[in-house]
Amino acid sequence: MIHVTVPATTANVGPGFDCLGIALSLYNHIEVEEIPEGLVIEVSGVDQDLIEKDEGNLVYQSMLKAFKAIGYQPSGLRIKQYNGIPVARGLGSSAACIVGGVLAANKMCGSPLSQDEMLEIAVEVEGHPDNVAPALLGGVVVSNRYEGKTHYVRALVHEDLKFLTAIPNVPLGTKEARDALPRVVAFEDAVFNVGKSSLLVAALFSGDLEKIKPALQDRLHQSYRAKLMSSLESVFLETEKAHLDSVFLSGAGPTVILLRWQKEGQREIKFRDIIYRMEENWEIQDLKGDNIGAQVLN
């Protein structure tokens, strides 16, 4: 039995739309083994009823992609998934399944694929690297596609960074969140995000944490996606009124994160108070960065 664990990820991180991601200390566990024939999938944990348990299962589909690249055909598979990452909440649940499947298949075959080869397979399944890259590699990752290849730069998440993560009990589909975005944006908004994302990446990579707060603002996606859920829009309005300037939408949403890096009790209390006043039930988890990424545990 091969056991792998994969971290959750937060993509975009404010202005870093479709290119910036950070691995977080929240995990999915996947166990796989080859069996004489057939396919057996068992799922437990968070949102287990939302996970397919047949050939449409994302872990299974990702394993098949890796097996094809390796040139191996298993006789049958048993897959056990334990979900710690909520589904369709903007925390990279799909990326975790994809990376876990690719890593497990590679290990089953004696690990012939390099890390970069596994990343390319994961990107092929997911369609973009912003979540799968930090899920596989850990840390803070800036990534992009150029001439059919994934290019990335990785840094460690600073040990002082904390991610106070508010997760609503209502999922938001990635397609719905993508469809909410405008096809054309104002030139000044594009320039605004280039400046903010450049400063944010420099601050995260250099460890100059005081430069993070003035770099987290966004004009390309958050305001449009916030309108998809009334309480989400209220969260952003209320946090702005409370001068909580390090709050951002995780991925496509609806999860919201307060990023902090020192003992900021009053800011945390304000954030929790705002979240708990919302209509939907929200769960708050205090997470940190994961600098290891996906790994085989046995």
Curated annotation (Swiss-Prot):
Q: Which NCBIfam families match?
A: thrB
Quote the function comment for this protein: Catalyzes the ATP-dependent phosphorylation of L-homoserine to L-homoserine phosphate.
Q: Kindly give the Gene3D superfamilies that the UniProt entry links to this protein.
A: 3.30.230.10, GHMP kinase, C-terminal domain
Please tell me whether the keyword Amino-acid biosynthesis is annotated for this protein. yes
Where, subcellularly, is it found? Answer: Cytoplasm
Pfam families the UniProt entry points to: GHMP_kinases_C, GHMP_kinases_N
**For binding ATP, which residues are annotated in this chain's numbering?**
P86, V87, A88, R89, G90, L91, G92, S93, S94, A95, A96
GO MF annotation, one: homoserine kinase activity
Family label: Belongs to the GHMP kinase family. Homoserine kinase subfamily.
Stated EC number for the protein is 2.7.1.39
Species per Swiss-Prot/TrEMBL record = Alkaliphilus metalliredigens (strain QYMF)
GO BP term, example = threonine biosynthetic process
Pathway(s) it belongs to? Amino-acid biosynthesis; L-threonine biosynthesis; L-threonine from L-aspartate: step 4/5
Q: Which PANTHER family match?
A: HOMOSERINE KINASE, HOMOSERINE/4-DIPHOSPHOCYTIDYL-2-C-METHYL-D-ERYTHRITOL KINASE
Catalytic activity as recorded in UniProt: L-homoserine + ATP = O-phospho-L-homoserine + ADP + H(+)
Q: What is this protein called?
A: Homoserine kinase
GO CC, alphabetical: cytoplasm
Q: Which UniProt keywords apply?
A: Amino-acid biosynthesis, ATP-binding, Cytoplasm, Kinase, Nucleotide-binding, Threonine biosynthesis, Transferase
